[in-house]
Amino acid sequence: MRKMQYRSHRLSEELKKEISKMILEEIKDPRIKAMVSITDIEVTKDLRYAKVYVSIYGSEEEKRETFEGLKSAAGYIRHEIGRRIKMRYTPEIIFELDHSIEYGAKISEILKELNKQEGDDN
């Protein structure tokens, strides 16, 4: 059981490194113009699927276009992963938007505003 978790975690880290490198240096899709950050990768127990959570910085239009570009590049990314990482099955790449960073920034702004208001009251 623990061996599978270790293997899954190790594969997630390797995938994160390789996919980040591909997005930065190799994918030439003009839709991918916003800054993309891979926040997490979840690999299923059978190692057949990898959910790649991405945070995209930019306007709403840039986010939408960039996400569409990433989804269309999933096949290329899977092919390249198969060439670069030796494993029995190459996982299918599924991109998911991660809003946690935006959510955290909003909470931080709210807390700053509350602290500012509290300071004004004193």
UniProtKB/Swiss-Prot annotation:
Cytoplasm in keyword set: yes
Domain of life: Bacteria
InterPro entries the record matches: KH_dom-like_a/b, RbfA, RbfA_dom_sf, Ribosome-bd_factorA_CS
Keyword Cytoplasm on entry: yes
PROSITE patterns: RBFA
Pfam family, one: RBFA
Recorded GO MF terms: ribosomal small subunit binding
Record's keyword terms, sorted: Cytoplasm, Ribosome biogenesis
A GO BP annotation: maturation of SSU-rRNA
Protein location: Cytoplasm
Record-linked Gene3D superfamilies: 3.30.300.20
Similarity field: Belongs to the RbfA family.
Quaternary structure and interacting proteins, as annotated: Monomer. Binds 30S ribosomal subunits, but not 50S ribosomal subunits or 70S ribosomes.
Cited PANTHER family: RIBOSOME-BINDING FACTOR A, CHLOROPLASTIC-RELATED
NCBIfam families documented for this protein: rbfA
Function: One of several proteins that assist in the late maturation steps of the functional core of the 30S ribosomal subunit. Associates with free 30S ribosomal subunits (but not with 30S subunits that are part of 70S ribosomes or polysomes). Required for efficient processing of 16S rRNA. May interact with the 5'-terminal helix region of 16S rRNA.
Name of the protein this chain belongs to: Ribosome-binding factor A
